[in-house]
């Protein structure tokens, strides 16, 4: 379809001329890593805390942008027209990796800190399973991009920490002190509850292990992927409501009636990706039935023909359009269409969502990137920063990379 080719071309333009240059500009050459805060008014705080999740995600992003370049998805000529060379993408990934290795990873107790001061010294020494997972995700992709075996060794050290320190017999635990004593999970709890276990952490451990398995085919990692899929299907997925539950007690009883629209559409394609990487027919059959249902349900209840609402908490819909939810919507519906081309409505939804993003979510101001969130009518919400520990190129950059890889441009 010509519309899909146009989508891929526009995603490539957004990646090359906007997202990559913006995040290259956030590089801190004095203290390492990337600056941690840019306000809505585009005021850079060079002394803001540096979130380790943010730096893992930036490293992942540049590693995958380089892999896209290496695979021919973007050309040297296209890079140079945007003001950089293809090898500059690997240089950025190396810069991020060096910061992770030298500052974010705790050399005394192992694992990765939650955040650092601007100068690379520890600030919040919480060890969170979610955070360990994103570092594995970054290190695995960086290993693929750079061939650096030390990065792979670090990824496996974090894998071992998660499996030895951050699990019980039924799932993944969440938050720990620096020396891995359990603590309460405020960091991954929202909506007025305090969760012992979360869908979000399980999903992103799965995502990280998928990438680690992709680059190694390690049998132990593959077995954990299967275990996570069973846990997801048996504990997290709610077949009656055709959605994931989000927050749980220690025994995986749900503690809040919450439908996270963005996580459901993201999970649908990430689970499909994991099934493809694992290449196990039993799990393909088991999980595909669920991911098809998640995609269909989100299309029915959360997509208004143009964009995706945020969530529904105890029957009340939050209609804000959040940057990461919109980005995952494009990939999720494109994935749904690719796996069943009879569902042309998913293709139309991905195209319509991109129109909404480029019209309202992409910030046209010089020196900015994407708005954090906009109202249902597309007007920006003015108090949300452009960069902070959670606001990163992982969702929107990945959307562009996925669109280019899936469609070609």
Regions found by a protein language model. Give the residues of each.
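Glycan-recognition and catalytic cores of secretory/periplasmic carbohydrate-active enzymes
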Residues: 1-409
């Amino acid at each position: 379809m010509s519309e899909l080719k146009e989508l891929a071309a526009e995603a490539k333009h957004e990646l090359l001329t906007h997202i990559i240059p913006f995040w290259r500009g956030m590089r801190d050459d004095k203290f390492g890593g990337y600056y941690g805060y840019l306000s809505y008014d585009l005021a850079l705080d060079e002394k803001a805390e540096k979130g380790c999740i943010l730096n893992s995600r930036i490293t992942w992003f540049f590693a995958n942008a380089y892999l896209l370049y290496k695979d021919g998805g973007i050309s040297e000529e296209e890079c140079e027209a945007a003001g950089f060379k293809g090898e500059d993408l690997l240089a950025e990934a190396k810069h991020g990796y060096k910061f992770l290795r030298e500052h974010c990873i705790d050399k005394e107790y192992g694992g990765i800190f939650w955040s650092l001061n601007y100068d690379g010294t520890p600030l919040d020494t919480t060890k969170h399973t979610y955070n360990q997972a994103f570092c594995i995700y970054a290190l695995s992709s960086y290993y693929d991009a750079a061939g650096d075996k030390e990065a792979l060794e670090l990824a496996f050290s974090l894998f071992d920490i998660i499996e030895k320190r951050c699990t019980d017999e039924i799932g993944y635990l969440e938050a720990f002190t620096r020396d891995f004593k359990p603590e309460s999970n405020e960091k991954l709890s929202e909506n007025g509850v305090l969760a012992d276990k979360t869908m979000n952490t399980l999903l992103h451990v799965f995502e990280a292990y998928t990438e680690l398995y992709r680059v190694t085919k390690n049998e132990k990692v593959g077995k954990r992927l299967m275990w996570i899929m069973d846990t997801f299907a048996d504990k997290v997925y709610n077949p009656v409501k055709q959605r994931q539950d989000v927050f749980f007690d220690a025994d995986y009883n749900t503690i809040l009636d919450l439908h996270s629209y963005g996580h459901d559409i993201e999970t649908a394609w990430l689970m499909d990706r994991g099934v493809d990487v694992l290449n196990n027919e039993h799990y393909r059959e088991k999980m595909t039935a669920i991911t098809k249902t998640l995609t269909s349900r989100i299309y029915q209840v959360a997509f208004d023909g143009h964009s995706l609402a945020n969530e529904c908490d105890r029957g009340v819909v939050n209609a804000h359009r959040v940057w990461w939810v919109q980005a995952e919507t494009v990939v999720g519906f494109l994935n749904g269409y690719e796996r069943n081309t009879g569902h042309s409505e998913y293709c139309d939804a991905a195209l319509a969502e991109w129109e909404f993003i480029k019209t309202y979510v992409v910030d046209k101001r010089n020196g900015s990137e994407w708005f954090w969130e906009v109202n249902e009518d597309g007007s920006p919400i003015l108090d949300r920063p452009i960069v902070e520990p959670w606001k990163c190129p992982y969702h929107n950059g990945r959307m562009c990379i996925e669109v280019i890889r899936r469609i070609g441009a």
